[in-house]
Amino acid sequence: MRRWWGALLLGALLCAHGIASSLECACGRSHFTCAVSALGECTCIPAQWQCDGDNDCGDHSDEDGCTLPTCSPLDFHCDNGKCIRRSWVCDGDNDCEDDSDEQDCPPRECEEDEFPCQNGYCIRSLWHCDGDNDCGDNSDEQCDMRKCSDKEFRCSDGSCIAEHWYCDGDTDCKDGSDEESCPSAVPSPPCNLEEFQCAYGRCILDIYHCDGDDDCGDWSDESDCSSHQPCRSGEFMCDSGLCINSGWRCDGDADCDDQSDERNCTTSMCTAEQFRCRSGRCVRLSWRCDGEDDCADNSDEENCENTGSPQCASDQFLCWNGRCIGQRKLCNGINDCGDSSDESPQQNCRPRTGEENCNVNNGGCAQKCQMVRGAVQCTCHTGYRLTEDGRTCQDVNECAEEGYCSQGCTNTEGAFQCWCEAGYELRPDRRSCKALGPEPVLLFANRIDIRQVLPHRSEYTLLLNNLENAIALDFHHRRELVFWSDVTLDRILRANLNGSNVEEVVSTGLESPGGLAVDWVHDKLYWTDSGTSRIEVANLDGAHRKVLLWQSLEKPRAIALHPMEGTIYWTDWGNTPRIEASSMDGSGRRIIADTHLFWPNGLTIDYAGRRMYWVDAKHHVIERANLDGSHRKAVISQGLPHPFAITVFEDSLYWTDWHTKSINSANKFTGKNQEIIRNKLHFPMDIHTLHPQRQPAGKNRCGDNNGGCTHLCLPSGQNYTCACPTGFRKINSHACAQSLDKFLLFARRMDIRRISFDTEDLSDDVIPLADVRSAVALDWDSRDDHVYWTDVSTDTISRAKWDGTGQEVVVDTSLESPAGLAIDWVTNKLYWTDAGTDRIEVANTDGSMRTVLIWENLDRPRDIVVEPMGGYMYWTDWGASPKIERAGMDASSRQVIISSNLTWPNGLAIDYGSQRLYWADAGMKTIEFAGLDGSKRKVLIGSQLPHPFGLTLYGQRIYWTDWQTKSIQSADRLTGLDRETLQENLENLMDIHVFHRQRPPVTTLCAVENGGCSHLCLRSPNPSGFSCTCPTGINLLRDGKTCSPGMNSFLIFARRIDVRMVSLDIPYFADVVVPINMTMKNTIAIGVDPLEGKVYWSDSTLHRISRASLDGSQHEDIITTGLQTTDGLAVDAIGRKVYWTDTGTNRIEVGNLDGSMRKVLVWQNLDSPRAIVLYHEMGFMYWTDWGENAKLERSGMDGSDRTVLINNNLGWPNGLTVDKTSSQLLWADAHTERIEVADLNGANRHTLVSPVQHPYGLTLLDSYIYWTDWQTRSIHRADKSTGSNVILVRSNLPGLMDIQAVDRAQPLGFNKCGSRNGGCSHLCLPRPSGFSCACPTGIQLKGDRKTCDPSPETYLLFSSRGSIRRISLDTDDHTDVHVPVPGLNNVISLDYDSVHGKVYYTDVFLDVIRRADLNGSNMETVIGHGLKTTDGLAVDWVARNLYWTDTGRNTIEASRLDGSCRKVLINNSLDEPRAIAVFPRKGYLFWTDWGHIAKIERANLDGSERKVLINTDLGWPNGLTLDYDTRRIYWVDAHLDRIESADLNGKLRQVLVSHVSHPFALTQQDRWIYWTDWQTKSIQRVDKYSGRNKETVLANVEGLMDIIVVSPQRQTGTNACGVNNGGCTHLCFARASDFVCACPDEPDGHPCSLVPGLVPPAPRATSMNEKSPVLPNTLPTTLHSSTTKTRTSLEGAGGRCSERDAQLGLCAHSNEAVPAAPGEGLHVSYAIGGLLSILLILLVIAALMLYRHRKSKFTDPGMGNLTYSNPSYRTSTQEVKLEAAPKPAVYNQLCYKKEGGPDHSYTKEKIKIVEGIRLLAGDDAEWGDLKQLRSSRGGLLRDHVCMKTDTVSIQASSGSLDDTETEQLLQEEQSECSSVHTAATPERRGSLPDTGWKHERKLSSESQV
């Protein structure tokens, strides 16, 4: 409809009945007056608009009585005067533009397989409800919402997603509803030692850290790297390690992920046609203020006065001045626009015919004639255009207009015809094509998963999850397969389209596979790799892999195939960005585009449209071109921050964007109709449209027999080519060789590669091996086609066939740095050097029968080679004295052959023909050779090699690898000349060999029955040519051929990171690592159970005690909590117990061998206990104490009869052992540097060995003592009787700790507890007089002295950073026991629910509230979002509610105990709320607030009737607890350093304890007050009545936080909410005299009632399978009381009130404003109603003022301050002032942040607490006697006149007196008790110790503050 011009309404009169009368309308002379409307409106239009065929008046009055133009007899006359062809009548198209040609048409009957549209069209039935508007009027998409299955979650918008996507951290619903109200996710477990943890928690191999690749997906693995892999020439290295084009530096675009390419740049200058963004980037000036954020910082859209462009209807013309006129008024000779923009010369108007009318000769017009303003105007039929003469008509070629037809177009005279390719069908609009088949699905990689989404429905499903870093993607529709590449794993994988059967396709030789494409016709897989700069091809299963293109490739990225044309297309964004193409066999390579490209990412082909589309992330553009590169055009050039991948389907483009994390779509022709398909994705990468028509059928050039090819058949144009896998030679035109006979084999750390000598290109390919992390040494055995390699990352030696099959680990234990490897192909032996252990070892080629050959005088041995003909082996050693040595292959006849002019002798090689030894020296930069005995030394290549490493010989050539040039080179082996480079740009080159089949045969006696050896037969230079030997630690018997069965006597010792054994059965000492597959970080103490053959050890870093079999199997942790520094450990093999000392906790404990029934034996007067030994037969245990007063002690093995044996002349008593044969005690002292001995009672003490440098562990076996020494890093031995004959057992062992000597042949002693555990229910422990029964820590032994209680009854529960512990109050030891709750990080507050036995706690590191059972099971997150710093927590055990304070958000909230029904109770006038406590029986809620105005407040449990109890003389009120018996509150003040109490009304305030250091939390039980103290790191207690009898319950505990008491007497009582939740549907809150029902802040989908017992009806009817609608957050809290009747309201969904609810009085209809008709006046009744309303309000106010005046007579004078707040009100005894004097400087300095910690340095550990927790330096000064304070509970009172005051206190605290009565009684006795100050504050006395905060102590006077 045209805009309305002229006057609209002159006026209207108002009457009492609201009826308007109209005036006569009169327009000017130049205007036409339209008919008066029913509303009395007058409309004037320009006179020239009359009789122009347009309904300008709106009622056709301007067209009534007009003569319409005539139509020819062949045409149809439309109602609006338009003439159309009669054949167009009733064809379903609105050709008249007023639908008159489609009126009164007989209805068309649709076929059975068609759907009838409402506009009369018929479409295919399968198009109904497919998401496409096929009818044109959207009637085919008016569909019922699809029902979600049982395994799906329905989003709020109705779409369905997988059920397990709910609350998974990813926004899968388009509206984000799947991530609302979710518990917090459990943090990712920490990575192990060999892994690196990415910023978002994922673990990758540590070798990927700082390797230049984005393995994490967010570049966090490449940040903070001290050294980066260098970028290529022409590239710029970002700070994160990413390499980009150097031309992108300082260009205004942040191309680096960390924006480092735009730092320190001079201001860029933009041209006159460009706009400079705030970031410095230049964009087109025309993009300024166009509504699109082209700058990416929105600076091009700022300060735009009018960003919206005027819009006109499709049949209108937009004038330059913004007016809209009808298209018919163009070029009519009249200035309709008013600015002449509709006429010449602004418009190309046709000349007029000059005829007077259309009745004569059709006005001179060739087709149509019409009279316009009295003149003839010619027009043409649809399909024609008027020519220059203004008379004749010319055919319009619609096919020339791009996008006029979706696919094919045929032009006809006056018309056109669109047609579609096979597989498509023309839509009813006759122009667009719709693909036949199933509904299209967008398949995209999301880094961590692969998902699919329906583009028109928002249906979103998961295909594959738990991926590492999925980038590229493609599918094979016919075979129902999906393929993807993972750039973290460097692999290509595939799976079925249903997500099943995941398997690896290509697992080796990949570095950065960024592009992937499937040839669905010939079943081939193509991919690009920007790391290797290659394009490769293979079968769909990865077989027959071939490097297709590798020359002149830099960084190939996207790839697309056209199998029907046999063409491959790819993008390359190296230094010369381009798009290229070639045949699919690699031939016919050509450039498609190489200009105006920077970062061409995505690439796709429109097969039906015969075009290609690509995205450029640098230019922020989507472009298209023909397949030959012609007709290139930008489709979208703005609003594209970082497009990555693109796909096309039908007429739409779909692309992913990294910056917006979204999938978008637009029209493929125009770029218009842009739409966000999905956003808030994790990291969208590649994308494809999953549909059969995206892979149309094509001719398979290879046919059914693979083209007759033996391996690969690759299409090439319209033909094909047979090709061979890389390295295999072609025998003829169709066949390839089946094997490789000779090839160059080299290691490249991450893979092992080969270069075939059978082909001319010498391109390398990867042997497909798994899990190669850091390969160094290589060798091979052609007899079984095996390749062997060492890996210094996994510390393994492995082997596989040369084709990668049969891979297996050969040696995987006791390796540290296997640097050299050699195969004896004669005896099938494997030799290797280990630079970490400094050994040369040998084993069978399968790794069995391993033994140490040489272990002495080795210093970093490197390469090794063998010469079986002579029986010698040769190795290089490049330690402090570099040398080359040789020895017999059985270790005999060892000698140094080269020792001078060597620096880093690396690779070795033997020329068996000329008997020469070659070596490469990286320090000397030479390659040299000499005779096998070291003679005739000569330099082959000197001072010309940057860094040679690996070396090998073959034929007449020598080959070597070079680290610095990253190349493989060769030269003549005799002269060193004729050098050539075989391969370059190869990172991390290591060893090199040539695999061939011409090794010389050698005869040996070992080939005949193994030479008669029982185990190993080795070649030797001795006359027999061989010798027998045994595996390490096993003795060779006298026959020289047979080995003993195993170790009987051995040493076992801890070396921090492993446990090792040294056999004592053999004449030499060699340590063997116990192959325990567990992480060890700081293994200290060790013990052995010879009965079961198990070793036990403690790890003081991991804080655990573990055990395993001596062969490394059956490993397990037995103690994982409550350990700090377990320095000593002893196994009672007879009594089946394990004992240990803990220097951190100063305890000695015992437990069963599996860690159960743990008990603290000794805990008093211990100061760093260390070593411990047992004497079960005597019932004694002995230990050393390393503290300030070092000593040796003894007690019974049950902790009884404790005695100090020696306490003088001791320094650091470390190791300890008992000699049972001589009844002596031996110990090692690292300070006195002596090993001493004494009798078992401490007598006859004397020195045995002196000096010893730093002995640690000590043990004894037979006649010798053995000890470890930190200083010498060795194990020593001496005679146990004399201390003489000291020898070195093993050296070069850093990290030596404890040691034990074991003889498994020795018999065990008698078990004192017998076979029935002494009749004890739990522990039976030996003692000198027999045994005693004992219970686990904290549990009492019953009266029978045999049986234990099941669990403690009353105990303290407290938090300490990463732990929750308990202390039993039933026993006297008061030792803490860890509650085994997993995943604790920084626990602050906690509480307990005695009903279900669960502990609730807050973790401020994770910002969650969780709960768990006391045994650590059933841990779950209760509140997982919307928290900042939850410092206080309280459980309402009656109403089953949970309360908490949030210091970060300054709120107090509540929920059900399961976290549901969450509601904010108080969120105003809070400033750092801290502790919180509830009194369910009274309906009270208490909390502390220590913001600028510290205070303690109280409210009802619903937050109402808020009252400030105390706000004077407060500093930092931390902890808060209630004494439910005496009805008093207790709190600790960390600023004033005291503990105080008051009654429940804040009256009768008393200081209980002063001069406490830094109290944090407190609790109460019986007559005791317990509190935690940060400064003293202890839990203490005092008498709650007197404040005396102060005791330390637990000391030396870091990070103490909250503390509570769990007792049957603690959580008692009930209230109205205790029965059936008070009848409430959601929340029930008890109050002082009533209770209320309340609704959560966020609706949970269930109707909420505020009336007890009433369940409101659903707001609308729903089907059984349909979920109820979500209720809005509009439900207030409503009071329910037996004495008060309150009107209630209930709102339904969407805020609507049903009629039934309104009739019940549950709610009221909202007053919706109804807009009046134009010109209608206000009704008089409205004014009267308004006056009555005002009068009513005044009456209410007057009544309220009168009521308050009367009420003030009976209330406390201080309660006059009533402050209204929402949602409730609070009353305050005193006015709350927001301004206060600033706290002293120490306040700010000691304010706790989340990053702080309660220690002096504030940097040791990170505690996540926000300004709600304070740390105050203080001393342990004595607290005063509080002389001014007296209590009636503490004894007789000196002044009996104060007895009444105390009586008032008791009555008030019990609740029998209200506030007014209490105040009156206190005032009566004020004069009598004036000398008693119940809130006195004693003065501090004494000086403060130096704690590190001495000069920042709290100010002592108010004036200083």
Swiss-Prot record:
Q: Where is the LDL-receptor class A domain?
A: 26-67, 70-106, 109-144, 147-183, 190-226, 230-266, 269-305, 311-350
Which residues have a glycan attached per UniProt? 264, 498, 719, 901, 1077, 1415, 1467
Pfam families noted in UniProt: cEGF, FXa_inhibition, Ldl_recept_a, Ldl_recept_b
Q: Where is it located?
A: Cell membrane
**LDL-receptor class B repeats (start-end):** 480-522, 523-565, 566-609, 610-652, 653-693, 785-827, 828-870, 871-914, 915-956, 957-998, 1093-1135, 1136-1178, 1179-1222, 1223-1263, 1264-1306, 1397-1439, 1440-1482, 1483-1526, 1527-1568, 1569-1610
* Any GO MF annotation of the entry: coreceptor activity
Disulfide connectivity for this sequence is 27-44, 34-57, 51-66, 71-83, 78-96, 90-105, 110-122, 117-135, 129-143, 148-160, 155-173, 167-182, 191-203, 198-216, 210-225, 231-243, 238-256, 250-265, 270-282, 277-295, 289-304, 312-324, 319-337, 331-349, 358-369, 365-378, 380-393, 399-409, 405-418, 420-433, 702-713, 709-722, 724-736
User: Which CDD domains does the protein's record reference?
Assistant: EGF_CA, LDLa
PTM comment: the record says:
N-glycosylation is required for cell surface location.
Which biological process, per GO, is one annotated for this protein? Answer: presynaptic membrane assembly
Q: Which domain of life is it from?
A: Eukaryota
In terms of PROSITE patterns, this protein maps to:
ASX_HYDROXYL, EGF_1, EGF_2, EGF_CA, LDLRA_1, LDLRA_2, LDLRB
* Side Extracellular, residues: 21-1725
Cytoplasmic topology: which positions? Answer: 1747-1905
From the record, give the transmembrane residue ranges.
1726-1746
Task: Kindly state the subunit structure of this protein.
Answer: Homooligomer. Interacts with MUSK; the heterodimer forms an AGRIN receptor complex that binds AGRIN resulting in activation of MUSK. Interacts (via the extracellular domain) with SOST; the interaction facilitates the inhibition of Wnt signaling. Interacts with MESD; the interaction promotes glycosylation of LRP4 and its cell-surface expression.
General function of this protein: Mediates SOST-dependent inhibition of bone formation. Functions as a specific facilitator of SOST-mediated inhibition of Wnt signaling. Plays a key role in the formation and the maintenance of the neuromuscular junction (NMJ), the synapse between motor neuron and skeletal muscle. Directly binds AGRIN and recruits it to the MUSK signaling complex. Mediates the AGRIN-induced phosphorylation of MUSK, the kinase of the complex.
Q: What is this protein called?
A: Low-density lipoprotein receptor-related protein 4
